[in-house]
Amino acid sequence: MSFSPLIRQLIDSLRILPGVGQKTAQRMALQLLERDRSGGQRLAQALNAAMEGVGHCKRCRSLSEDEVCQLCLDERRDDSLLCVVEGPMDVHAVEQTGFRGRYFVLKGHLSPLDGLGPEAIGIPELLERIEAGAFSEVILATNPTVEGEATAHYIAQILAGKGLIASRIAHGMPLGGELELVDGGTLAHALAGRRPISL
C-alpha cells in the first residue's frame, strides 16, 4: 500500500520508538487517523508539552520538569550513598526497591565502537558530583552487560584512589527462577556471587 507524504512522515516518526518496526508503526498511524483522532491530538499535545517542559536535573541528570528534581530536593534521603545508573528509567526501577540514597544518571555506557567514551556518557560530571557531595559509598548499578560491566569497572578504578567504597549491584538468579531455564553466564555470576546463609 502506498501512503501519502503526511502518513509516511507519521509512520517514520513512530518508528523512532524502541521496539516499533515498520508494520507496528503503520498500525499505530492508521489507528490514530481512522479510529482515534482525539487520542492522536492528545498524544501530540502531551508529546509537545513533554518535549518543551522536561529537561534534566542539574544534580542527578534524571528527567525533570524543574531545574532540580524532587528526588534531589528530598532532604530525608541518605546523602552518604550515591547510586550510578545508565538512564532515567533505571532511577525508577531502583526507587521501586525502597532505596533512599542519591542518584547520578549517566548517558548510557562506555562503548568505544559507538564513539561513547567517558566524556560522552558524563563521567567527568559524575566525578564533580562525587567531589561536591559527602558520599561514603558509590553503588554502580549499570546493566549487567559487557558494556555495563566495563563502565562499572572504569568508574571503580577512578574511585579507588578517592577513599570511597565502590560497590556493584549483585546479579544472578532471578527470584522464583528455575536453574534449568537460566543461561550459563547468569548462573556463573550467581555462583561466583554466592554468600553464606545467615541463621
Curated annotation (Swiss-Prot):
Zinc finger (C4-type): 57-72
GO BP annotations listed: DNA recombination; DNA repair
Record family assignment: Belongs to the RecR family.
A molecular-function term among this protein's GO annotations: zinc ion binding
UniProt organism field: Ectopseudomonas mendocina (strain ymp)
Pfam families: RecR_C, RecR_HhH, RecR_ZnF, Toprim_4
Domain (Toprim) ranges: 80-174
Protein name: Recombination protein RecR
Record SMART domains: TOPRIM (SM00493)
Annotated Gene3D superfamilies: 3.40.1360.10, 6.10.250.240, RecR Domain 1
Top-level taxon of origin: Bacteria
InterPro entries in the record: DNA_Rcmb_RecR, Rcmb_RecR, Rcmb_RecR_Znf, TOPRIM_dom, TOPRIM_RecR
Classification of source organism: Bacteria, Pseudomonadati, Pseudomonadota, Gammaproteobacteria, Pseudomonadales
